[in-house]
Amino acid sequence: MASSKERENFVYVAKLAEQAERYDEMVEAMKNVANMDVELTVEERNLLSVGYKNVVGSRRASWRILSSIEQKEESRGNEQNVKRIKEYLQKVESELTNICNDIMVVIDQHLIPSCSAGESTVFYHKMKGDYYRYLAEFKAGNDKKEVAELSLKAYQAATTAAEAELAPTHPIRLGLALNFSVFYYEIMNSPERACHLAKQAFDEAISELDSLNEDSYKDSTLIMQLLRDNLTLWTSDLPEDAEDAQKGDATNKAGGGEDAE
């Protein structure tokens, strides 16, 4: 059994790594804590999440940039450059796959078995949904179908736990609804489902705004605004009858949604 001193040291190293923007080392430090098979504190949980978010985020950004350049080169007929870009994309995709698989192992083998609180259960299942979604962003064919299905199951498990354990205004429940709706819009190509989920979460939170915890007011209202922004973007993709059902949500140009991470 690892000592509390070791745990404290890993957490401190993770905080240092975050300040120094050395996110790979931040992840390693927090993985060491997770591997102790202890229930993480809110602070530890957030450190782990921030580390992985940055490690995967830089690769997702790289992938998007390279994909955009690839499209431009294809339109110009520069086959040699397209070939070079495809090879580079494969490298980034391999890194993304490894990072996402890595966090899945940590969640499934250490974090979920060690957690008792409903909030943590929602948090970890949401994380699984997010990282399978990141895989679905670049996978194709059956591989995409498989990770999309796993993402859906994780988001559904998180939603079931959230509805049982967390208030509609809780930032983790709202963040889950935000990311789950992005999954429907971007991965499942279902703007109707995305809008329904986002609007339902927004409306339920609005109805309980008076009971909003002062500590989480800023986080909750920020996510509610993101839900609203996405609804504004997405309603222009709906058929007219479905759009009417959104009860006056403003329309704007269609585009990808913002997610909580």
UniProtKB/Swiss-Prot annotation:
Residues 239-261 are annotated as: Disordered. One of its GO terms (biological process) is protein localization. Disulfide bonds: none annotated. GO terms for cellular component: cytoplasm. It holds the Pfam family 14-3-3. InterPro entries: 14-3-3 (IPR000308), 14-3-3_CS (IPR023409), 14-3-3_dom_sf (IPR036815), 14-3-3_domain (IPR023410). Belongs to the 14-3-3 family. PANTHER family: 14-3-3 PROTEIN. Homodimer. This is 14-3-3 protein 9. It comes from Solanum lycopersicum. The lineage of its organism: Eukaryota, Viridiplantae, Streptophyta, Embryophyta, Tracheophyta.
